Amino acid sequence: MDYVIIAFRSRTHTIKFAEELRKRGIPSEIVNTPKQAYVGCGLSVKVNKRYFPIAKRLVAGLSFDSFAGFFILLSNGKTVKSV
């Protein structure tokens, strides 16, 4: 299964974003940012790829200035691609 990693440069924003997803019933997990992404504060939010459109709209609507990008984490758990 592929996942989307949502990276921020702020741990506070990472946690707040995960809380916003939870409020909307979207399952997410706070994870270590994959080193292949080369961005962020070290923590990111991971969601199933099917929730990517919702996460994208939510990031835009909340205007987190520390947002660093979206990345696809492929099922092998090692391949990361910028979206």
Placement of each model-derived feature along the sequence:
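Absolute protein N-terminus
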Residues: M1-D2, V83
